[in-house]
Amino acid sequence: LIPKLAEAIGCPEDWLILELAHSSFYAGGEQVPGFPIVEVSWFDRTDEVRERVAEILRDTVMGEGYPLVQVIFTTLYQERFYEYEQE
């Protein structure tokens, strides 16, 4: 997955971080079966790149047997992004 995404985005593989968070889904006060929700936080890319990344994620998740997947993109802004690393 990482090599495909890095190629589509045009970035080094080590720029990409995946987080797997297990969730419970509820509707009408009852627990219901869930589905994968893939959230992508990134700096703005072209529509073509976004579409390609969505396709890669869709194909990967559905290839694992899930009939439904949501892919949600959130655009980050350079002037509002802070990253700190202790030396």
What is each model feature region?
Residues L1-E87:
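Interaction-mediating elements
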